[in-house]
Amino acid sequence: MSTDKYTSPLSERYASKEMQYIFSPDKKFKTWRKLWIALAEAENELGLKNEQGGPAVTTEQIEELKAHAEDINYDVAKEREKLVRHDVMSHVYAYGQQCPKAAGIIHLGATSCYVGDNTDVIIMTEALQLVKNKLVNVIDELAKFAMKYKDLPTLAFTHFQPAQPTTVGKRAT
């Protein structure tokens, strides 16, 4: 299974490689890990205490999370999901296997919506930014085309019938 691109019959045909990556499992689960790191950093910064009164989240744990943020163990997560039937908890477990010192703080105080909903917002924002950038390029190229051919006469059409003269540049706008 490819994890670096989103696959469907439509995406295979019509989506750019950039868009396929934005909606890929890799992007999704790496974003989950970034969110868990951000959560741990915030809990550390705010001085969250454990039951003994010490820091609940240490910088050593955060560094361990960062060291494994990119290397997702899909096989462990897949096997764990068969057991717990929960995608978020299976990835918490898989991440914890890679980060034994930080295992207890991954997803600490969060709900599944924390990673799920925030990741959806991040992915949609990035996808819309990509569409915006590509659309700006199309508009720019169309404007260049219209200016290049602003004086080239051609016949206009209305209801598929020949009409008055116009220019190719005007027809492009």
Q: Across the structure, where does each feature detected by a protein language model lie?
A:
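A helix-coil-helix interface module used to build multimeric assemblies
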Residues: 1-173
